[in-house]
Design a protein with these regions (language model features):
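Glycine-centered tight turns that cap/initiate beta-strands
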Residues: 27, 109-112, 118
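STAS-typified acidic loop motif
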Residues: 4-6, 10-47
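Conserved catalytic submotifs in the C-terminal HATPase_c
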Residues: 25-26, 64, 96, 120
């Protein structure tokens, strides 16, 4: 599955904080945050997730370049899960780093949102 930039692909961010790139792969919106997701930076991830307008949205959040995530990031992922599933879509998490996976497991978000070890598995049907 080749990954290609979405027509509305964008990158938002600030140096030393968080940047977010959005692409598309086989009709699936892929959100690539890079950096730390915390109270000060989480708005960028929220903005990327709030732009989902498709019926039955399919979303993968690639966490492979996220070095830290606090409860702000967890809350955004849970809200996105609720919004996407209410629209008959799905959201998956891909390739969380060890510290991020630990947080997801501690608060049991990985029981709510499917978490895959790499992006290719998260994109698979």
């Amino acid at each position: 599955m080749a990954e290609e930039p979405a027509p509305d692909s964008e990158r938002v961010g600030q140096p030393g904080g968080l940047s977010v790139t959005t692409t598309a792969a086989d009709g699936i919106r892929v959100i690539h945050p890079t950096g730390e997701i915390d109270h000060h930076t989480c708005g960028q991830l929220q903005q990327a997730l709030n732009t989902l307008t498709a019926d039955r949205p399919r979303v993968v959040v690639d966490l492979s370049r996220v070095t830290f995530m606090d409860s702000s990031g967890i809350n955004i992922l849970i809200a996105a899960y609720k919004n996407v599933t209410a629209a008959d879509g799905w959201i998956r998490l891909a390739a969380p780093t060890t510290p991020v996976l630990r947080v997801l497991q501690l608060v049991r978000v990985d029981d709510l949102i499917h978490c895959y070890p790499d992006l290719s598995q998260a994109l698979a049907p």
